[in-house]
Amino acid sequence: MQLFQPYHYAAFDPPKPTQDDPVTVSERIRVRDALLRLDEMLWPAISRAGWDLHHHRQRTHYVSSDHFITLDDGTQVVNFIDGMWLHYGKSPNQLDYIKLQVGGYDYKRRDDDEYYNAFYLHTRIQFYLNNQVFRAWLLLATDKNYYDRSEFLKRLDKSPAAKEELFRLIQPLLDRDFFYEIDGERFNLQSGVTQELLVRFVRRDRPGFYSGIVKEYAPNGPLLDESRIAEEMIKNLGLLYPIYNFMAYRFDARPRAT
């Protein structure tokens, strides 16, 4: 039996992404519940691995919103939901450090006590589904990103060693159906890829783009069966985490073990 059933994917069929009525929200809540079940399967392995990879500090935000969000002043900050995700990223301490040392990111003075250190403005590993596909996704940056992309690209520009390290970290992903994606354009990670070709593609990234490394699964894929999905996604975490650790910019001097 699949963890994510056809009705989970159907929760994002048009015109539902533009709707927020009780029936549509109830469908998204079922998606949220399934993603939290996936978290229960994955989190013990993440904890045992000792990775610097964390939940959002508020359980409410372990999974993306299942309903539209409107600020007190009437500004809509979530008014379209065509997919949902479970995500892991930087620690609360690291995000608090950013606030104390360099200031927060205040997007339209959002009335959210977590927005000053906006977990979702930073590099994350997430498990995502829409009406067509399930993704394991190392998300370097969204259309709004705080430091990670710019600092990562600076390192690639300035340091031959950084280029070599990225290429080294990519090797375990080759021929496993992963691709690097920038603004919807894909670069397949497969045998024959050279460091020059990889870096040339990665450096095309720009502010305002979604970018990262993805592996996709068809909704009826056997590896998404309840008996296999945990093993498969833990394997993906093991492959993606060293690259996440390399890409994610941190404001302290801790060494980054890979």
What are these regions (language model features)?
Residues 1-57, 64-65, 182-258:
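Long, solvent-exposed, polar/charged low-complexity segments
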Residues 13-20, 24, 124-126, 130-135, ...:
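Broad hydrophobic/π-residue packing in well-ordered secondary structure
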Residues 78, 119, 172, 203-205:
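A generic structural signal for short, solvent-exposed coil/turn residues
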Residues 26-29, 132-200:
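Compact, glycine/acidic-enriched structural inserts
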Residues 56-84:
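Long amphipathic N-terminal alpha/beta scaffold segment
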Residues 7-9, 62, 88, 97, ...:
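Sequence-level detector for tyrosine residue identity
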Residues 74-165:
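Aromatic- and glycine-enriched beta-alpha-beta binding-site module
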Residues 2-5, 19, 58, 76, ...:
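Residue-identity detector for glutamine
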